[in-house]
Amino acid sequence: MTARMDKRFAELKAEGRPALVTYFMGGDPDYDTSLGIMKALPEAGSDIIELGMPFSDPMADGPAIQLAGQRALKGGQTLKKTLQLAADFRKTNDLTPIVMMGYYNPIYIYGVEKFLDDALAAGIDGLIVVDLPPEMDDELCIPAIRKGINFIRLATPTTDEKRLPTVLKNTSGFVYYVSMNGITGSALPDPSLVSGAVQRIKQHTELPVCVGFGVKTAEHAKVIGGSADGVVVGTAIVNQVATSLTKDGKATPDTVQAVATLVRGLSSGARSARLVAAE
């Protein structure tokens, strides 16, 4: 639903603060624990949830998210179960936007039309599919938009002025600026470079620009949130899950609470990065 996403960003703009966008891996380390994490995210201050779709060959992800995907797959997580996670979450939360993030192969195998219908029924608001370039928009992007599901595109430091309009052409919901080249979990980029990149993208679109890669602490969220419409945190959350598990990768009574504690701190940082509210 594009309306839920648009409403959330409008509310945040009125409040004069950036969104805190939190990523976690669906099914890590098991279904019930990941549902508990998902429910805890908004309560801890997350404004938008990115729901990871586990995949056996996640080429753009760093070691932490790769391991999270492996734990989820080992626990029996499937794309169908990841959609069910969203549906179960929606039973008690109809306000927080959910963006599914992952790779095209599981969606292709599931069936594009069936996936989009099931995603819509589960309350999914947007998709980020990292290995589908704009040249393949007819595969999933255009059908998703026709169904009313946002298709969020990634921009990087190497997305130049010539390429940017192509990247943004069918993008909706928000633009996800990957603040450095490489895999997820890298170090925090230079804030001045991030600010310049956000302004450059905004010259080409009216969509919100959210920045990810390298954000791990409340201070990071505050610094990056000072120039962006949203701050995306993924690896830090996935690591928090991992460190709470038993030696054999099972959840403990502390797993959900450990994530909630981290997100509360990140939320505090993001909320202190005051943006200029709309007149």
From Swiss-Prot:
Name assigned to this protein: Tryptophan synthase alpha chain
GO cellular component: cytosol
UniProt-listed InterPro entries: Aldolase_TIM (IPR013785), RibuloseP-bd_barrel (IPR011060), Trp_synthase_alpha_AS (IPR018204), Trp_synthase_suA (IPR002028)
Keywords: Amino-acid biosynthesis, Aromatic amino acid biosynthesis, Lyase, Tryptophan biosynthesis
Broadest EC class assigned to this enzyme: lyase
Catalytic activity: (1S,2R)-1-C-(indol-3-yl)glycerol 3-phosphate + L-serine = D-glyceraldehyde 3-phosphate + L-tryptophan + H2O
Pfam families attached to this UniProt entry: Trp_syntA
Assembly and binders: Tetramer of two alpha and two beta chains.
Pathway: Amino-acid biosynthesis; L-tryptophan biosynthesis; L-tryptophan from chorismate: step 5/5
Keyword Cytoplasm: no
Role according to the record: The alpha subunit is responsible for the aldol cleavage of indoleglycerol phosphate to indole and glyceraldehyde 3-phosphate.
Gene3D superfamilies: Aldolase class I
EC number: 4.2.1.20
Gene Ontology molecular function: tryptophan synthase activity
The family this protein is said to belong to: Belongs to the TrpA family.
Protein's organism: Rhizobium etli (strain ATCC 51251 / DSM 11541 / JCM 21823 / NBRC 15573 / CFN 42)
PANTHER family xref list: TRYPTOPHAN SYNTHASE ALPHA CHAIN, CHLOROPLASTIC, TRYPTOPHAN SYNTHASE, ALPHA CHAIN
Alphabetized NCBIfam families for the sequence: trpA
Location of the active site: 50 (proton acceptor), 61 (proton acceptor)
Gene that this polypeptide is encoded by: trpA
